[in-house]
A protein has these predicted regions:
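Conserved N-terminal alpha-helix of the aminotransferase class I/II PLP-enzyme fold
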Residues: 38, 42-85
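N-terminal "arm"/small-domain region of PLP-dependent enzymes with the aminotransferase-like
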Residues: 1-49, 179
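Active-site phosphate-binding strand-loop segment of PLP-dependent enzymes
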Residues: 126, 130-181
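Short, small-residue-enriched loops and turns at beta-alpha junctions
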Residues: 29-30, 57-60, 112, 133-134, ...
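Conserved PLP-anchoring active-site segment centered on the Schiff-base-forming lysine
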Residues: 93-112
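Short, structured coil segments at secondary-structure junctions
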Residues: 100, 120-122, 177
Length: 181
């Protein structure tokens, strides 16, 4: 494993060299932001170094609830939920939204968390060629009257190669076939 000697926003120091970190969660540099560090110290003093269990049993703190309320207020929604990682967010959200009467279609290069969420959902699981709108259209046409719900899932930016999805075209295609995106 590569040892990181120092974090600096989207950069790291490894072996005395400053490098761009393409796999960082802190691509906006917020891990070193003074306000974020101040609030983290406050949480450390109040709650210690971690929760006392998983959130569903005994791990939800006042900080979790306040964060979710602020997110919901910012978005103008009834509620929000914060997850500990993107992987868990994808896994639980996808598997909750879909069931055995639905179909989910995802790009062949989708992140593993998307694939796992799709498999856990019990929905019909289909994959289309990478960023290939014609292949997706073929799947959507075939699914037109066969399923209660249709969900198309893509990465906005594919983490393994940096490709960007054709979002405006995907929105139009999903709208045309009555699929969620």
């Amino acid at each position: 494993l590569q040892q990181v000697d120092q974090l600096d926003g989207a950069h790291v120091w490894i072996g005395g060299r400053r490098m761009v970190m393409f796999s960082s969660y802190s691509y906006l540099g917020l891990l070193k932001h003074p306000k974020v560090q101040e609030r983290a110290r406050e949480a450390l003093d109040r709650f210690g170094t971690g929760t006392h269990g998983v959130r569903i049993l005994a791990g939800t703190t006042a900080a979790h609830v306040q964060c979710e309320q602020r997110i919901a207020s910012f978005l103008g929604t009834e509620d929000a939920i914060a997850y500990s990682s993107g992987y868990v967010a994808n896994l639980s959200t996808i598997s909750t939204l879909l069931g055995r009467h639905d179909v989910v279609m995802t790009d062949k290069l989708s992140h593993a968390s998307i694939i796992d969420g799709c498999l856990l959902s019990n929905a019909e699981f289909q994959r289309f060629k990478h960023n290939d709108l014609d292949d997706l259209k073929r799947l959507l046409e075939a699914a037109a009257d066969k399923f209660e719900g249709k969900l198309v899932i893509v990465d906005a930016v594919y983490s393994m190669d940096g490709d960007v999805c054709p979002l405006p075209e995907l929105v139009a295609l999903c709208h045309e076939y009555g699929a969620w995106l």
